[in-house]
Amino acid sequence: MRHLGAILLCFAVGCGATNVSHGGTGGTGGTGGGKGDTGGGSGGTGGGGTGGSGGGTGTDGCSDAAKLIYTIDQDGTFSSFKPDQTDITKSVFTDIGKLNCNAGLAQPFSMSVDRNATAWVEYFDQVTTSKLFKVSTANAACTATTFMGGQQGFNEFGMGFVSNAAGSTDETLFIGGGGTVGGASNLGTLDINTLTIAKVGSLTGDPELTGTGLAELWGFFPDLTANTMQAHISKIDKTSGAESMQISLGSAAGMANAWAFAFYGGEFFVFLAKSNGATTVYHVTTAGLKDQLDTGSRHIVGAGVSTCAPTTPIG
C-alpha cells in the first residue's frame, strides 16, 4: 500500500521523528502495508481484543489464519479482517497487536505473507530506500533481513505473493513500484531466498498488488492525479506488466490519501481513504462495485492476504 499524504508532507516541510506506534502482524497477509502518519486511531467495525495465528493446518497446508485478510492502521494497529461476502456490514475486524520493528524514521509501507504464515513487511521513510522485515504472525516479533533497498530502481514498492500455478503451493513474490510514490513504476519479482530483485516490465500508474491461489496477479490503481486517472482494478500480466480485465471504480474517484488491496473468495476488497479521513472498504466483483463499508475511525494504510485465501465466495 501507499500513504500519499505523509509523502507530500515530507516533500513540503521535511520529515522528522513521528510519534507512531507500529502495529503488529497477525494471521497471514498479502499485499498491503503502507506509510502511516501520526495520529489517527483504530476502532471501527468488528471485534477488538488480541488474536494469534489461530487454527490448525488443513489439507491444503494452510492454517485458518492464513485465509484471512490483514490490515495495518496508521497508528500501527495490526488487525485481521474477516469479510462477509453476502453482507459486508457483518464483516469483522479483530485487532491483534502492534509492530515494533526498530526501523528508525521509516514506517510500514507494504506487506505480503507467505504460505508459511510469515509476514514480509516493507518499511520506507520517503528519503532513502526500503527496509524489509520478517514478522511472526503469531506474536508480531520482528526480524530484520539483509535486503538492500533500491535494487533495479525499486526504492519503494507494493507487493503480493502469487501461486506459480493454480492450486500450487509454490509461489513468487511480485513487486510493483519505483523511485517515488505516484511516479513511473515497474513490475518485478523479489527472491525471498536471495533477497534480490529482478525487473519484469513496466506498469501504467503505481498500483498496489494482490496475488491469488489461482496464479493471478491483480493491481488496484488509485486516483493520484485529481481524477485524470480513474481508480480501477486490473489483472496484470506476470511476464510483462500489461493490464487486462479492467474494473472501473467510479465511486472511488477522488485524490487517494491511503490505499490497500486484497483478494478474497474470488472478489476484491479495496481499503481507501481520501484526504485524512477514515477508510472505506469497497467490495468489488469482476462486474464492478458491489457494496462498501464505513470503518469508523480506522485509517488503513496496508492490507493483504496470502495465496491460501479462498478463491470462490464463501459468504
Predicted regions span which residues?
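Beta-propeller fold detector
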Residues: 88-101, 142-150, 196-205, 242-251, ...
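Ser/Thr-rich, Pro/Gly/Ala-heavy low-complexity intrinsically disordered linkers and tails
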Residues: 10-64
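Short loop/turn segments immediately following the C-termini of beta-strands
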Residues: 73-74, 83, 124-126, 164, ...
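Structural motif
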Residues: 75-82, 127-135, 181-189, 226-235, ...
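Short loop/turn segments that connect beta-strands within beta-propeller blades
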Residues: 83-86, 135-140, 191-195, 237-241, ...
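Conserved beta-propeller blade signature
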Residues: 68-71, 79, 118-122, 166-176, ...
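Repeated scaffold domains used in trafficking and secretory/extracellular systems
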Residues: 60, 101-114, 150-164, 202-214, ...
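An edge-strand/N-cap motif at the start of beta-rich repeat modules
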Residues: 58-87
